[in-house]
């Protein structure tokens, strides 16, 4: 079956594949757009699997405060170009929505399956490298900060009765933590020997 330039365009828009790949797929599938899209997806997933061991040193943090919890999700990729891609950012926000609505506290299969289509269309290795949930207990205030690089972030939870004052202080602590990368992030983690050295 013959296919037209409009068919190639429709397949490109549906799959994100290149023009030549779309033409080859349509030729292999006798002009059937649905079959060609399936073929391109299969080929794309196979190619994505080959990229799976490539380093993902770039990426973006997604942090949100919902109720008495602060949710953190880290989505990594190979290049900063992709980390700033609108589809990549939208996917991270959608993953955070799913994390919150389903009560996930760690990386789940659903997170990884949500990545598949974007891996195929963008052609980079990507990973959900972190999902964390920080509880904000009653009487405490939580705050967070994401630096302009979108990869560095911090969360601080502080007990206190003056909500406005504590919130400002917690946010200031977040800024300080992001800037100076402290050795310890919780009072209980600090060894007695280190405390003694500081006196």
Regions found by a protein language model. Name each.
Residues 2-199:
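N-terminal assembly/interaction segments in proteins that build large macromolecular machines
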């Amino acid at each position: 079956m013959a296919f037209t330039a409009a068919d190639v365009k429709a397949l490109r828009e549906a799959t994100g594949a290149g023009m030549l790949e779309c033409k080859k797929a349509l030729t292999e599938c006798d002009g059937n757009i649905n079959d060609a899209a399936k073929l391109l997806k299969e080929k794309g997933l196979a190619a994505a699997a080959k990229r799976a061991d490539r380093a993902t040193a770039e990426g973006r943090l997604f942090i949100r405060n919902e109720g008495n919890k602060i949710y953190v999700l880290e989505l990594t990729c190979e290049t900063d170009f992709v980390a700033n891609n609108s589809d990549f950012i939208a996917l991270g926000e959608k993953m955070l929505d799913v994390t919150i609505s389903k009560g996930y506290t760690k990386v789940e299969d659903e997170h990884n399956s949500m990545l598949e289509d974007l891996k195929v269309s963008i052609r980079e290795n990507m990973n959900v490298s972190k999902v964390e949930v920080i509880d904000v207990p009653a009487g405490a205030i939580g705050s967070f900060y994401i630096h302009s690089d979108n990869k560095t972030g911090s969360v601080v939870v502080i007990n206190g009765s003056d909500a406005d004052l504590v919130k400002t202080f917690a946010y200031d602590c977040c800024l300080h933590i992001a800037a100076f990368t402290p050795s310890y992030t919780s009072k209980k983690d600090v060894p007695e020997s280190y405390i003694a050295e500081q006196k």
